[in-house]
Amino acid sequence: MVFGAMKGGEFIVEPLTLPAHSDTLDLCLDTMVTGFRTIIEKLGEKPVAISFAFPGPADYPNGIIGGYLPNFPSFRDGVALGPFLSRTFSVPVFINNDGDLFAYGEALGGILPETNAKLEAAGSSKRYHNLIGYTFGTGFGVGIVVNGQLNRGDNSCVETFCLPHKDNRDMIVEDGIAIKAIKRIYGELSGDSDHKFEPKDIFDIAEGRIPGDAEAAKKTFAEIGAAAGDAMATAATLTDGLIVIGGGVTASHKYFMPALLAALRGKIHTFKGEETGRIQSKVYNLDEPEEFEAFAKGDQQKLKVYGYDEEVIYDPQKRIGIAISKLGASKAISVGAYTFALGQLDRM
């Protein structure tokens, strides 16, 4: 567990890392209290709130953690974590899913405002207000922000990890994307199922930095990219906004992004055989300068107002963009937690 403090959107003390002790509830909660108390003592003043990410399932609005938590088994029967910390430190406590906070941080202080600023600088009238954030790591996390508001759902259960995998409709897509999938797929493609490589090692193999099956490594990342893109296409169809990807696996984006983009740009057919896009908007890779230039340009044109000597700007091209996080997942989650707390305090 990592503890820190922010002011003005920036860290103001050195982060503190402590073991989670997740299998023993008393020790885990004691460690949390120690971590927060240590940070507060460094501040010299009382914080206005505590806000952080915690894995679900959970009733996040009420601060209750409970259910099937593989990494926090001692919480499975239900723990009123928010109320406990609020009473311990006498401040409001806000808990959210890490995928939600990643997306919120990117929407308010990352890729969304950055993209809109670049569009303005390019002379484009197009602006974006909606965003999907995905994290690639131990899981396939997601968060959705609509018009500046975090979509927490009615059950704190906005997820896409459980969408079906494109090649095995009975398997969740997360099992074809997460770290464990990268290791498994590389083992299958290389014929070395007993390997001990981590995703970073498999990336280094693809790059030719260490011995291994480079072709299998490259194909591994292509496979996870195709699976992720297929799932993202479903979500993007419903949210119609920008997509940002974060997490440790994004270092290998040169190998997974082509297949991911191919899936997003894929075609689907009607019963009569007519072809249409899997996503109705054109998808641009915002990290490629030439694609961003075309993205900013769109199909902007002047349209005469009927019956008046006046023109308006019209851009009929429907388009969305995807990019790798510049903030990084950890910073984006922290920014999301910080901004979420301030927003909630304003409403109190």
Identify the function of each model-found stretch.
Residues 21-33, 46-49, 58-128, 254-271:
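Glycine-rich phosphate-binding loop and adjoining helix at the ATP-binding site
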Residues 120-128, 133-136, 314-315:
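Solvent-exposed alpha-helices and their adjacent loops that cap or buttress functional pockets
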Residues 47-51, 131-135, 244:
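Short glycine-aspartate micro-motif
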Residues 96-109, 255, 262-348:
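Glycine-rich phosphate-binding/hydrolytic loop that grips phosphoryl groups
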Residues 95-99, 111, 151-201, 342-347:
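Glycine-rich phosphate-binding loop plus the immediately following alpha-helix
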Residues 1-34, 38-41, 45, 65-68, ...:
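Short glycine-rich, Thr/Ser-proximal phosphate-binding strand/loop in the N-terminal lobe
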Residues 16-48, 183-254, 280-281, 325-326, ...:
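Adenine-nucleotide phosphate-binding core of ATP-dependent small-molecule kinases
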Residues 1-6, 133-135, 140-145:
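Short beta-strand scaffold segments in enzyme catalytic cores
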